[in-house]
Amino acid sequence: MPPARSKARKRALDVLFEAELRGLPVLDLLAERITLGSPPVAPYAADLVRGVMVHKARIDELIGEYAEGWTLDRMPAVDRNVLRIGIYELLWADDIPDGVAISEAVLLARDLSTDASPAFINGLLARIAELKPSLELESPLDPDPSPDPDPSPEPAEVPAPVPGATPEP
């Protein structure tokens, strides 16, 4: 039996893939799957789906930039979503070692995609891991993960009066 996190990655892939295939909002489908509970959606699977969606613009930007010879649209849907999960784990899941994120993505590709997919996914994720220290993680297209709760401007500071000075007209 595969470890719990491996099963959770597979379940997250199922949700991302199904939503894309059926043209459904991912988070709505995730909520439906959690409610139905058959098959169950582990908390880590839900975290992966939500994390991918929060950072999707930046993740897709990175795939487009580093997937030599492939555009997102031309790539098999399974590969595209395996890469999204792998990149999310590499860049934002601090408790997952890079090697684990890469090898788990390669295993998913080996089980579910084309013969060429594992090598392609391994190469792309290894490149992202190598560049990780220099990558800007937030895209201008991503929503600010921590918006300012009070968007009102700061009041201008008024200098304190100086004793003995006359006010300017």
Specify the residue positions occupied by each region the protein language model found:
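N-terminal interaction/assembly modules
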Residues: 1-169
